[in-house]
Amino acid sequence: MNQETETGQQQGSNSSSPLGLLNRVLPRRRASVLPGFRLALGFTLVYLLLVVLVPLSTLFWKSSTLGWAGFWQAVTSPRVVASYKLTFGAALVAATINAVFGLVVTWVLVRYRFPGRRLVDALVDFPFALPTAVAGITLTALYAPNGWLGAPLERLGVKVAFTPLGITLALTFIGLPFVVRTLQPVLESLDPEVEEAAASLGASRLQVIARIVLPALFPAWLTGFALAFARGLGEYGSVVFIAGNMPMKTEITPLLIVTKLEQYDYAGATAIATVTLVTSFVLLLTINRLQSWTARVGTAEPS
């Protein structure tokens, strides 16, 4: 009896100790089927440190050597501001176009069966497999004033190559797979019987799309939009040929950074890159928060 009392007292003292409280507060990690959690976690942290954090820290450190006045002057010159407007504007327009047409392409690939469907599905990934420089040369050859498509458009008064329109076209070309491949698994998991049940209860096609399909696809849709937008901000190879690279007109920010590096202005290049990085990160974080909010709202609506 005394031994049981002493054991209970020891357990009570252990539970009231800091270590005991910590064990009760922290959830126990489930035993994994595959061993090596600490090794995998260590490898992940080292990878993030060497590949992500160290380069970004170096970027911020190098740009800080300019001082605040030099940094502000480097990132607010008229040439730099013009490149910001062109890069962010073209990336935003291209991502919006890809969001619309990507939804249509995904719907056709998932909901319809037709000859050549697998070929069309494979062609969606073509911009992933094609080197960006090859894509840029191909688009330039097509839409140049003497190109197959550029010559007829030129006669109609539409100039594509060496204009902001050509930049938007190139970003649209490389960004479409991000939207399609993000939406496709979500749409495949959406049961068509739910739509049929809503239609049998009197819902119109527009109501089915607006209240059933789009709310389920919206988080993935935002993710695809964000990925296409982020890819457009940093795209260089497919844009540099068709842009024309005229300062204040068709000069994109990645090209301006390369120009600064060729002029050995490393601090100025890192300053421009820092502004682009911070702005794109804030935009992507905002989109991510909006995506999480819409997912929570969509989950709470049925209850």
Residue ranges and their predicted role:
Residues 1-44, 286-303:
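Transmembrane alpha-helical segments of polytopic membrane transport and secretion proteins
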Residues 32-67, 74-188, 212-237, 241, ...:
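Membrane-water interface segments at the C-terminal ends of transmembrane alpha-helices
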Residues 115, 203-205:
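Short coil/turn motifs that cap or connect alpha-helices
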Residues 190-194:
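Short glycine/proline-centered loop/turn elements that form peptide/ligand docking sites
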Residues 198:
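The alpha-helix within a helix-turn-helix
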Residues 201-202, 215:
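Glycine/proline-centered hinge or cleavage motifs at structural transition points of membrane proteins
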Residues 241-250:
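Juxtamembrane non-transmembrane "cap" segments at the membrane-aqueous interface
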